[in-house]
Amino acid sequence: MAIEAFAPAKINLTLHVTGQRDDGYHLLDSLVVFADIGDTIRVSASDRVSLDIDGPEAGGLAAEPDNLVLRAARLLAPERGAAISLTKRLPVASGIGGGSADAAATLRALAQLWGLAAPSAEQALTLGADVPVCLFPVPARMQGIGDRLGPIPPLPAMDIVLVNPRVAVSTPAVFKSLIVKENAPMNPELPRWRDLPEFTCWLADQRNDLAEPAIAQQPVIADVLNALRDAGALFAGMSGSGATCFGLFPSDGHSAKSVAKAVLRLAHPGWWCAHGRVL
C-alpha cells in the first residue's frame, strides 16, 4: 500500500528580521501561508530506504544521503525501510520551502506507513528552520528561528501567482548583506481582516527585510515584482530569501490564471510560473 502526502509551497507573506543570536542564527517574525502548488511524496513498504526523484523540477536533485527527504526518514526511524518517491514541481532553493516541505511531507507519510507518532516541532527543527511550519501546513505566525509557531486570525480567500526568474540567490550572502539585523517585529496582536483589500493594505505596511539585499544580488527580482504589480496583483512580494515572488489576486478562479498564462508565461517564457489558491 502506497501512502501519498502533498508538500505545498510555503510563502512568507511577511518576513521581519528581528535579531541575531550568538550562534549566528537569525531571529524572524513571519506570516506564513501555503498554496495548492507543490511537490508530492509517495511512500511504500520496503526492506531498505530508497529515494526516486522525478517531475519537471527534478533536474539537479540527487538521492544523496544529505537529501532532506532521506534525512527525514533517518530522523523518524533510522532502522526502518521504505521506498520513497518525490515528484518535484517546485524550483529548488527558491525561497518557497520546497526542500523543507518535502521533508515535512516525508515525515507525515512515513509516520502513517510505520504507525509512528509524528515528530515534534523540536525534532523537525533539526532538519531546517522551515520544516516545523511545513509539518502541519496551515497559515501561521513563525517566530524565533522557526521554532515558535502560533495561529493567526482567519485569512480572506485569495488566489496566488508564484514566479521564479530562474536565478540563484545565496541565502547566507543575503543575510550577511543586512546592515540592520535588529528590526521591528510585526505588532504582537494581528488585526482581523474583513476582506482581501483590507488584508493586502495591511501587508503593504509590513516588510520582507531580505528583499533589498536579494534584489541587490539579483536585480531581476525587481522585474518580477513589477511584472506582477503591472498585471494587477493586489499585493506583490518576495518569499523567503528569494528569488520566488508572489502576487495575490481575488479568489475568482480566473484572475490569477489569466495573469500566469497571458502576462507572465507569454511575456517571460524563461520564468517559472504557477498559479493556485492559498490554502
Swiss-Prot record:
UniProt enzyme class: transferase
SUPFAM superfamilies named in the record: GHMP Kinase, C-terminal domain (SSF55060), Ribosomal protein S5 domain 2-like (SSF54211)
EC numbers for this chain: 2.7.1.148
Function summary: Catalyzes the phosphorylation of the position 2 hydroxy group of 4-diphosphocytidyl-2C-methyl-D-erythritol.
Binding site for ATP: 91-101
Enzymatic reactions: 4-CDP-2-C-methyl-D-erythritol + ATP = 4-CDP-2-C-methyl-D-erythritol 2-phosphate + ADP + H(+)
Family: Belongs to the GHMP kinase family. IspE subfamily.
Organism domain of life: Bacteria
One Pfam family this sequence matches: GHMP_kinases_C
Gene Ontology biological-process entries: isopentenyl diphosphate biosynthetic process, methylerythritol 4-phosphate pathway; terpenoid biosynthetic process
Tagged with keyword Transferase: yes
Active site per database record: 10, 130
UniProt KW keywords: ATP-binding, Isoprene biosynthesis, Kinase, Nucleotide-binding, Transferase
Species for this entry: Ruegeria pomeroyi (strain ATCC 700808 / DSM 15171 / DSS-3) (Silicibacter pomeroyi)
Protein name, per record: 4-diphosphocytidyl-2-C-methyl-D-erythritol kinase
GO molecular function terms listed in the Swiss-Prot or TrEMBL record: 4-(cytidine 5'-diphospho)-2-C-methyl-D-erythritol kinase activity; ATP binding
Pathway of action: Isoprenoid biosynthesis; isopentenyl diphosphate biosynthesis via DXP pathway; isopentenyl diphosphate from 1-deoxy-D-xylulose 5-phosphate: step 3/6
